[in-house]
Amino acid sequence: MSKQNNRIIPTNRDKKICRKCGYHVCSDHYVANLNKHHEIIKNHNDKINRVNMNDIINIKLLFHILLPRDSFNKDKVISRTHDIVCSLNDDFNNYSSNTNTMNNSKYKNIIKQIFGANTIKQGIYLSSDYQKIIPEKSSNIVFELGEIYYYPVKHKLNLSKYDDISDVESQRHEIEQYVRSSEAGAYEPKKFVNIWIIDMIDTSILGFSNFPWEVVNSCHGIIANRRCFFPEEYGESNYSSFKTFTHHMGHHLGLLHVYNPNHCQSKSCDSSGGSKSIVLDFIIDPLDKINNKKLHIDKEYNPYFTNFMDFTCDKYVSNFTVRQIQEMRFMINKFKPKLNSLLNESQCPIPKYNPETDTISATINFNQRFSNREGSAVPSYEKADNPRMSASQGMINPEIFMGIADPQQPFLKPTVVPTNKNINDLIPNLCGTTLPTRKSGNTQDQIIENIQNVLPSSYMNSEQPKDAYADFKKKYNIIYSEDSYIINHPHNPYLLQQHHQDISAMQQQILEEKNQLRRATIDVPVCGNPYNAGQTVGHYVPPINPEEIDRFNAKRQFAESFNPEMFRPNDPLMYQSPQVDPSCCQKPMDPRLYRPAVPSDPRMGQYMTDPRLFQNGNQTQYQSNPQSNPQFNHQAYSQPNPQAYPQSNPQMYPQQTTFPPRYDPRMNNPYASRATSNGLSPNNVVQQYQSYYDNPSNQQSNQQSNQQSNQQPNQQPNQQPNQQPNQQPNQQSVQQCNQVNQEALNDLRSRNIKASPTVSPGDLINKMNRVNEQLQNIKSSLQQDPDTSTTTRVNTAVGQRSFGVPRVSNDQSKPKFNKFGQPITNSPFVSGNVASTAMSGKITKENISVNPRDASKAPKSRFQRTKPPQAV
């Protein structure tokens, strides 16, 4: 643990030397970009030498602060970002033809300070060979502070488990994952330069950066350590002038580290005991004559250590070279043309997180969606004039406030349309290049000639090299040979992407060759009208896509394996097996698989047999051939053909079992005779005869439907044709069923009763039965005792029926319990009083017998208490 400037910095190991950049010659990522850089320079060397150096390129910087909330001050962060912007502008633009001013003068002072009395070394570094590579004018690349964004980070990034040299790629991936987890992704990396300030511990690397030709992702930009952003907190003196940001900005704009013949031995790898140790040889402090003895003694060793792209500490670097400035401007124009905010308007979103209040604020209105800073010039450390001062920042348009103050005034401006414009000026530029000189005149020939001059050339006229495929294949074999770089570095991201592109290009080339061979074997139609007599036209077949062939083969295989028997609605193949035993096919199918032909009798169960089907030999009509029934002619009800599956094994499938007939359980009910005596069924009889009663004209159609229902096939396939079914004790005959139906029909029509759909059939039947018995008791009492008053006899008869016999309900079998969990039995007592009929002794066999002596044992109300028995 160490304490610097009242800030505790935890550390697990000693870091001897800090390094500006994580890239070095042993990094796979850097070597891949090194090859890409050399390829770009080789292909565009002429364009780089002729690049325009006078146009101003204005670049906006976005700072993403990923620091713990209590470890920094917001005002200090704003001040430090302005210092970094000033340092970048000075390093890129403070150059002059006068060698005694600006960075030119700074270079001389550094050489004199390092070598002192060593005039030989001073003469080498101050010679014309070194002086001519220093720029004599500004690069005209200006930097501007766009916006600062804060993120609620709770912890620092610990990189103690990685080595700073051998695990540099793993460190980079860990940092990118930390940025993504903090939801601090890059904002429009093609229009802005995103810079992340991260609090890293246990690492000596000060930053990473992306090259302009790399794939743009959420971490595309510059990643800087807090050590180079707040160097005073760490007591850092070697990297306190913010030249680390200049170094990484050069990487981000396409520059590499400075290499010359003196740096060819800058990498040394010593292998011992199966482990590899990497030692990097670079100059950090040129005044250190012990570690840099060769620099002060050897006349042939003269590295260019004052360049910003070297690893030298901040106080000994001073300039770029002319070639480096040309490369940076070319990379911006080629890979990031939208980075210039002067040509492409770009607005930065306002920050939402406030680190002082630890809150996230949303957008207030449309005017505050983007940041609009004051248009003041960027300050500089130098007093000399600089072209960057001409770059102005965006300001709020005053017309917006005028429109808000006066909403009736529209924001429309009259557009000036020139009149009598020459028609040749309206011809669009379709070729995308400099337009040729157009001829004046409005004649038809001149207009057509001007239009033809601006038409783009056809791409079919461009000649392709004949041996392009051979060169590509030769290059591919060289790159992917056993001694190539990609074999030794398989995890190179750039080469891995290039490998996939090469493979896809080769596959496309092979496919095109196959299509050409196919077209060569097919007669191509000749020019002219193919319908003319005597003209032969060959049949042209276009090339077939391999994906279409695969889809066609898949459809053909599915069609061959498709079995239509599997998709029948009631086919047993859907639930038994793909094949059916032929022995089972000879028998009729299970009747449960058929759709019922007529509605079953409501007094019977689901699988109960209607006795009317056995009358007059109706079951023999379709017993021998059930398929003869016209109702089963549909394909869904047809029997499977046994010859369709000749290879099936009969032992594989069990025999179909025959289910015995099930009878209505209500027939065993002692109250079933009373319930059905009046012709009412507890199921759907009321609803069945309700429709009949509403339309009495349906009586004739009902009789015809009853006659047709007697002709339906039997539901028991194993029953013999001439054999009558066994008569069960509770099973009714056909005459009884018809008689019950007729009685119920007559009873409903005589009473003028319509069943309510909300009343259950069981309750309606019980109520009607009680009413019938009450009427019968009243009639019998009037005949037996004519002297008694009518009111007394009616009350007696009604009370006898109401209180003497318990009511019949559908839930007799369900036990009932009181609130104490005790079972409740049917009792003749009502509210603690014995029924009048029970007390008088007029209880018949139809009613429940009650002993009058038990009246004293009647249960009292639960609100009354009885005294406990006293001991004798």
Swiss-Prot record:
The keyword Nucleotidyltransferase does not apply. Signal peptide: none annotated. Residues 496-524 form a coiled coil. Residues 687-736 have a biased composition (Low complexity). It is found in: Virion. GO terms for cellular component: virion component. The keyword Transmembrane helix does not apply. Its main location: virion. One of its GO terms (molecular function) is metallopeptidase activity. Residues 595-736, 844-872 are annotated as: Disordered. Pfam families: Peptidase_M43. Residues 615-659, 670-686 have a biased composition (Polar residues). Keywords: Coiled coil, Virion. Gene3D superfamilies: Collagenase (Catalytic Domain). This is Uncharacterized protein R722. It comes from Acanthamoeba polyphaga mimivirus (APMV).
